[in-house]
Amino acid sequence: MPTISQLVRKGRKTLAAKSTAPALKECPQKRGVCTVVKTTTPKKPNSALRKIARVRLTNGYEVTAYIPGVGHNLQEHSVVLIRGGRVKDLPGVRYHIVRGTLDAAGVADRKQARSKYGAKKPKQK
């Protein structure tokens, strides 16, 4: 424990906050190419087949990203945009793919929360 005079001389070092999405390098989104598209199972107590993609980013990083929404058109060599945001029940998945941009099509027949899934406004009758 430091003395008062030591604190006056040196002060306390502030700990730098650790980034939750280090591969983005302070950018809001990054572009990348899918290397693997597959499904995986979540950890207990959940059960599902979650769609994920391994993405090589333009800065050289390779990350695992979640594909949100029902159905997708992604395959190997698809160009995608990723954003930060982890998936709580998938360990190691810290990024989301942005739907409706580049090669990732928006979710079909989506009526609510459309902007989050890149869905266009449905035609009025």
Swiss-Prot record:
One of its GO terms (molecular function) is rRNA binding. The modification 3-methylthioaspartic acid is found at residue 89. InterPro entries: NA-bd_OB-fold, Ribosomal_uS12, Ribosomal_uS12_bac. PROSITE patterns: RIBOSOMAL_S12. It comes from the Bacteria. It holds the Pfam family Ribosom_S12_S23. This is Small ribosomal subunit protein uS12. The lineage of its organism: Bacteria, Bacillati, Bacillota, Clostridia, Eubacteriales. The gene is rpsL.
